[in-house]
């Protein structure tokens, strides 16, 4: 098949197709001055998004927008297509045009009817070196000049069907079809054939004006190409499939666990914030119950227990302290006064509040219980040597013996009760005169209260501070009618089922109270308020006081009864002094004189 090559010649701008001259060279080459730069371009500006086709590969303009801003008027360029196996050429044929011919409509010609002299082939270049999917620029340029077309694959024939759907009557790529050339075609030449009338719009013109060019044959030799000014690696089908198969890393899902979605207290999953801090539902409920009930917890270790999802329920004290440490606000928790509406944060104080000491009521009640236990005889060391349950015993013996026994029991209890008072936190810090006044004023009250709590009024057993156990009838002649009031008070006290913690607070309040003649009554009042708050917290949340209304009031109501019993004791001592059967001990006599109201 003869190869005809077109040689470029100069032509004035705007020359019409009829004014062009054509000449054949002796070598069989065909020269034409017809190809003006405008026609050579034939509107195949690859930066135009109209040429791109919707395929499985990324849009062609996506690549071109990043590497070029436009094309200048240049000679026709070559498509390079890396192929595996034997090298083949691409044949460009005319595809019949529809609805755009002004003068005549030529029927499509079959491949056999086309003259061989008009066949033109594109010779593909050798396959480039495989590159990474990143499409990095290689040192050996794949394009010979900036105006060259991008790599095409054989399957891109289907793009003509997509472009035919454009709004304009002519599809630019519809002018071409691609087929493989016979093997052995020289690589150095590029041939192209136009069969039939070719109508290419050069500039924006009215729809009725067109450039009509008869089908001609020309060739573009390789040597006339300009040196490459830009390198761009070829887009291989294998690389494109790898790009499409590669999964783009998606952002973490909204519900995936992260540090922002963990509870600040135990580390469990937390959906939102509660009381100012992102916490889980478990820690939110624990904090709410603790604040609403004003509960006080005790740490059995060193107040540094680990608080996590698995061990958060082991130590309530450390868990609540961590809730406060991470910033949970107690004032936001709804109380009875905020019932029916959400709590709101109070306004910020002008000066930062000083942090309260770590749970002082807990340490106070523990000290009170310890002082009570140390000042009471053990149940295994009680002295039953003088105990007799004989109803006739009150009639036997001398009165002086019973009176002396009465004085001995009082003096024996006095030293034990004083030792108990010295162990009360804060009592030893008071002035010595106030300590003596408080103790002497409350001695008889403490004597009756402790005796009533230890004794068993049902069996008539009275257990004194020194461990001596006597029957109620054995004390009648020494105590007189006072013993009956003590037993009755003991019965009422036993029926209240007071635990040892509440009783320790009641005993301390019986002594730490306002007395006439105190040197520093304010300090006494502060200590009294601490004990009252300690008793209130304990009774309300720790020993079933929630199920018994007015339980705290009933406990505090025992203190006035003790005052009445103390008055009865003073009357008994006064009566024994008047009787003068047995002289009272000096400490009892001083106690009597100091506690007289006149």
Swiss-Prot record:
Region annotation (Disordered) maps to 1-22, 337-361
CDD domains listed in its UniProt record: NR_DBD_NGFI-B (cd06969), NR_LBD_Nurr1 (cd07071)
Result of changing residue 323 to F: In IDLDP; uncertain significance
- InterPro entries tied to this protein: NHR-like_dom_sf, NR4A1-3, NR4A2, Nucl_hrmn_rcpt_lig-bd, Nuclear_hrmn_rcpt, Znf_hrmn_rcpt, Znf_NHR/GATA
Motif range for Nuclear localization signal (NLS1)?
Answer: 338-350
Q: Where is this motif: nuclear export sequence (NES1)?
A: 443-452
Compositional bias (Low complexity) at which positions? Answer: 8-22
Query: Which keywords annotate this record?
Result: Cytoplasm, Disease variant, DNA-binding, Dystonia, Intellectual disability, Metal-binding, Nucleus, Parkinsonism, Receptor, Transcription, Transcription regulation, Zinc, Zinc-finger
Task: Write down the DNA-binding region ranges.
Answer: 260-335
Metal-binding: is it a keyword of this entry?
yes
| Recorded superkingdom | Eukaryota
Motif position, nuclear export sequence (NES2): 568-577
> Which tissues does the record link to its expression?
Expressed in a number of cell lines of T-cell, B-cell and fibroblast origin. Strong expression in brain tissue.
State the family it belongs to: Belongs to the nuclear hormone receptor family. NR4 subfamily.
Q: What name has this protein been given in UniProt? A: Nuclear receptor subfamily 4 group A member 2
Organism, scientific name: Homo sapiens
């Amino acid at each position: 098949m003869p190869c005809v090559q077109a040689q470029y010649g100069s032509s004035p701008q705007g020359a019409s197709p009829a004014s062009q001259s054509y000449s054949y060279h002796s070598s069989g080459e065909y020269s034409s001055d017809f190809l003006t730069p405008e026609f050579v371009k034939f509107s195949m500006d690859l930066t135009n998004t109209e040429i791109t086709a919707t395929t499985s590969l990324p849009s062609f303009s996506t690549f071109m927008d990043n590497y070029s801003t436009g094309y200048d008027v240049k000679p026709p360029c070559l498509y390079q297509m890396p192929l595996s196996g034997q090298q083949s050429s691409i044949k460009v044929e005319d595809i019949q045009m529809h609805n755009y011919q002004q003068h005549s409509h030529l029927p499509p010609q079959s491949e056999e009817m086309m003259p061989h002299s008009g066949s033109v082939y594109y010779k593909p270049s050798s396959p480039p070196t495989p590159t990474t999917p990143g499409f990095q620029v290689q040192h050996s340029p794949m394009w010979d000049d900036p105006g060259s077309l991008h790599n095409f694959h054989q399957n891109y024939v289907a793009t003509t069907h997509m472009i035919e759907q454009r709004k304009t009557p002519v599809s630019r790529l519809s002018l071409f079809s691609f087929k493989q050339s016979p093997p052995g075609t020289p690589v150095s030449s590029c041939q192209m054939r136009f069969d039939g009338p070719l109508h290419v719009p050069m500039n924006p013109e009215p729809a009725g004006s067109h450039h009509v060019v008869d089908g001609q044959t020309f060739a573009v030799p390789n040597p006339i190409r300009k040196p490459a000014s830009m390198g761009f690696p070829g887009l291989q089908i294998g690389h494109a499939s790898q790009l499409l198969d590669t999964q783009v890393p998606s952002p973490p899902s909204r519900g995936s666990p992260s540090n922002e979605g963990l509870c600040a207290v135990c580390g469990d999953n937390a959906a939102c914030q509660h009381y100012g801090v992102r916490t889980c539902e478990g820690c939110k409920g624990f904090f709410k119950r603790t604040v609403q009930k004003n509960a006080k917890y005790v740490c059995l270790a060193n107040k540094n227990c680990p608080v996590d999802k698995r061990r958060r329920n082991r130590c309530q004290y450390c868990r609540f302290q961590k809730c406060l440490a991470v910033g949970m606000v107690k004032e936001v928790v709804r109380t009875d006064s905020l019932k029916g509406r959400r709590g709101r944060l109070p306004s910020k104080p002008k000066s930062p509040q000083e942090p309260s000491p770590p749970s002082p009521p807990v340490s106070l009640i523990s000290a009170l219980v310890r002082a009570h236990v140390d000042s009471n005889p053990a149940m295994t060391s009680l002295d039953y040597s003088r105990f007799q349950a004989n109803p006739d015993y009150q009639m036997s013996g001398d009165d002086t013996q019973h009176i002396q026994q009465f004085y001995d029991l009082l003096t024996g209890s006095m030293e034990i009760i004083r030792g108990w008072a010295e162990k009360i936190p804060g009592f030893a810090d008071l002035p010595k005169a106030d300590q003596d006044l408080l103790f002497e004023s409350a001695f008889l009250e403490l004597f009756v209260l402790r005796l009533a709590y230890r004794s068993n009024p049902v069996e008539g057993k009275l257990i004194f501070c020194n461990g001596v156990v006597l029957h109620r009838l054995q004390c009648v002649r020494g105590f007189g009618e006072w013993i009956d009031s003590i037993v009755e008070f003991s019965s009422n006290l036993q029926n209240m089922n007071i635990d040892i913690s509440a009783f320790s607070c009641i005993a301390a309040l019986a002594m730490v109270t306002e007395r006439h003649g105190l040197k520093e009554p304010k300090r006494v009042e502060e200590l009294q308020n601490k004990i009252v708050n300690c008793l209130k917290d304990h009774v309300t949340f720790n020993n079933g006081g929630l199920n018994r209304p007015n339980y705290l009031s009933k406990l505090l109501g025992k203190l006035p009864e003790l005052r009445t019993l103390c008055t009865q004791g003073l009357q008994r001592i006064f009566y024994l002094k008047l009787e003068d059967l047995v002289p009272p001990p000096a400490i009892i006599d001083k106690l009597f004189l100091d506690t007289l109201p006149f």
